[in-house]
Structures are given as C-alpha cells and as structure tokens.
Amino acid sequence: MLVPPVSMIMYHELPSIKNKKREKIPEGTLCVVCSDFASGIHYSVASCNGCKTFFRRALVNKQTFTCQFSGDCVVGKSVRCVCRSCRLKKCFDMGMDPKAIQHDRDKIRYTKALKKKREEEKRLKEMVIKEDIGSPQSIASDTYINTSTPSSSTMINILENDHHSYDPEAQNDVKAVIEDLLRLESRVKSLRNSYRFESQVSATSCMYSSCLLDDITYMAENTHENEGTIEPFECSVEKLREWFVRDLSLMLEWGKCLPIMERLLLNDKLALMKAFAPIFPLIQLAFYTRNEFECDIVIKLEPDCTPKPIPERLNYPDGSFIEKGNKPANTWEEMHTMLIDGCYKMMRQLKIKESTFVLYKMLLFHNPDADGLSSLGKKTIENERMRLLTQLFSYLSTERGKEAQTIFSNLLMMSATLSKTASFIKRVFDFNHIFNRTNDLIDQLIIVGL
C-alpha cells in the first residue's frame, strides 16, 4: 500500500502524535483549518500562525461574525480571510480548544523603556504636525493615504497604531506574510535570472489561466542557469522593451498568487495590474542590480594608483545595462538618473533587505487610486493597504529599531520617485509605439489599454 508523504497528511489523521503533549510535529504537517504548513500545536491541534492568531483574537475580543453566503464557505490557504464566520466555525469543528487560551499571557507591563518610547513618539507627532501646518496635505483627509504622495498624517496614523510592535502574535502575522512573499519572490527571481520563459501575449487571457509559478513542471523547464560568461552591453530601447515585457509577464503571474486576488472581480484585478505595470519592472531592476563594487572582493591598490570611477549603472540578468552618462539631458537620460539616484542608491543607503522589499512591493501594488476599480474593490484595497502600512512599520520597528521611522518615511517618498520615473518611461514607449505597434503587454498595460 502506498503511504502519502507527510506534507499531504492532516494532523487530525495522526492520533498517536496528537495525544502527546508538547511533542514536535513532523515537518510538512498541514494546518487542520486552512491546509497551510503548521507551525506547531496550538490550542490542541496542529495549526499555522495565522489560524492560531485568528482563533485567539476572535475569542479574546468576543467577536461575532456572520457568513454572507450559505454558511459552508471553503477555508483554504489562499481564501482563509474571505469568510471569518466559516473560518471560526472550522476552527471549532477541527478541535481548537477555547479553554487553552491564556487570556493574561500577552498583557504588557508599563516599563520605563515603554514609557520612554511613547514619550519619544509623542514628541515626534508634535514635531510632524508643526511642520505640516500650511502644507497642502494638512487639509487632506486622514482616512485616505496615497503612497505616491505621502502626507505626515500617514506617519501619525501608523504611530498611533504602533501597539502591534509589542504584540507577539501580530509580529508572527507579519513574519508569516513575509515568509509567503519571500517564497513567491524566489520563484519570480529564478525565472527572471534564467530569462528562458516565453512572455505572455494577452494580459486578460493570463488572468484567466492558472498561476505558472505553482506549476512544478513549468518552473523546472524555465529556471536552468545560463552557462558561459555574460558580457555587459548597453541597453537599447528595443532591449529595454524586451525586458519590460518579461517583467510584466512575471508581474501578472506574481499578482495572481496574492491572497487578495481571491476577493476581487476580474476588472478590479486588471485595474490593479495596469496601475502597477509601469512600476514593477523599474523596482525589480533597481533592487536586483548587482555591480562589481557590491561584491565582497577587496582590491588593494598601490599608494599612487587612482581607482577607476565606478560606472553608475543598472544591470539586467543578460548583461544589458542602463547607466548615467554625460549626454545632454533628455527623457531617456533623465529616467536613468532618476531611477539610479532616487531608487537604486536610496535602497542601498537604507540597507533594504529582501524581506522589507517584498512587503514594500505589496504596498505599492495595493493602489486604491487605480483607474477602473469598483467601489467595493476600492474599499477592499484601501483597507488592505492600511494593514500593509502598519505591518511594514511594525516589521521595521522590530528589525531596525530607532531607524524604522527614517526608513519608513524614505520608502513612502521613494514611491513618488518611482511614479515620476514611470511617467518618463511611458513617454519613451509612447513615442516608440507611434512607429512600432506590437500590441504586446506594454501596449496593453501601459500605453493603449486592454
């Protein structure tokens, strides 16, 4: 008889393990509620951090939920947030024990360190408010935040909700989100670095098909490393277009894997994709560029030897590059300068790690200003973006301490630079479109539309 692998076994199917208290669960065991990977035994059953936190909060806060459908919604890894009523019902059905909740476990004592931090935050708020008087943003609504033109109200709202930094379960939520995003990013990088895959032809058709990043056969065929030495060469407009189409194809596949897509209509999904299309290829290029001076090799020079100036360039995996030059200012050169100085250098000065990058990219994607969003879609995206803003600041506070506020503010301001750079690249492709109409993803998502 064939025995299924451990990763396919649900924990409630392992009675011998279930009865042993504090025993580590087998690697690959699935959450009994949503079938994500379980992080341990929580409230008497094997569950992931997300379901554990959801169950505890629902009971501690005495929340009541109502199903908007027939009361039997599917509770899976990618759709577990759709219906909280059915999710809580399944938690009980699978044996989660409310008596196992320790209600006083996470109470935070008022320590001197906490008092000092709150005083520092209060001082910062007062300082930001003083600076903001008379600015255009001071009359803007605090309930709506636009990451492309961030106001100080963004910072104030996040600081007021910074209790998440002290909540261990909230931190676990953020870490779980980042782990999922890093796994997804790893697949995107593998395809991008091998650049063997065939680019998508139609954005609409792509949104109807299954996600290729989850296709094991497809990934195996298209992620072989390229052999041989890669010689650098200057990127032409045609080569840049080729890489934009590749990155837009990856963006569509990446977007289809995001949990929020399960809650949106097709038109809302396409609206988000179109709004993010000019940004995604630029931020991928800026973050994943590696130049010779970034390696760990130190070259010792003679005392009288002057090192060669380091070219300020951004590289694609095939060796093509764009760089700052001494040519007269034009749209093409201005775009290079803005992307290199405003994004590439900024991320390196701030020492942005990939864990922060994937969360920041998610934040940029959730744009409630996207043209074509339905009223329900707009509201959904607004709520999700506020949640992501809080998670990003919470994560930075944990990882970077006092630097968090500076990094957070700079990332929000960098989104404006990305938007401006995107407008320049649109002009380049707009001009190119007049003489060369190809109806590729650039035409569909950036120039003409679907």
Curated annotation (Swiss-Prot):
Naturally occurring in which organism (per UniProt): Caenorhabditis elegans
Lineage, opening ranks: Eukaryota, Metazoa, Ecdysozoa, Nematoda, Chromadorea
Pfam families (UniProt xref): Hormone_recep, zf-C4
Compartments where found: Nucleus
GO molecular function: nuclear receptor activity; RNA polymerase II cis-regulatory region sequence-specific DNA binding; zinc ion binding
Zinc finger (NR C4-type): 31-51, 67-91
This protein's GO CC annotations: nucleus
Protein name per UniProt: Nuclear hormone receptor family member nhr-40
Effect of a null allele: RNAi-mediated knockdown results in arrest due to elongation and morphogenesis defects at the embryonic or larval stages in 30% of offspring. Furthermore, embryos have highly disorganized epithelial cells. RNAi-mediated knockdown in adults results in mis-localized or missing body wall muscle cells.
SS bond list: none
Keywords noted in UniProt: DNA-binding, Metal-binding, Nucleus, Receptor, Transcription, Transcription regulation, Zinc, Zinc-finger
Gene assigned in the entry: nhr-40
Tissue expression pattern: Isoform b: Expressed in body wall muscle cells, pharyngeal muscles, rectal gland cells, vulval and uterine muscles and neurons in the head and ventral nerve cord. Isoform c: Expressed in body wall muscle cells, neurons in the head, nerve ring, ventral and dorsal nerve cords and epidermal cells in the tail.
Function description: Orphan nuclear receptor. Plays a role in morphogenesis and elongation during embryonic and larval development. Plays a role in muscle formation and motility.
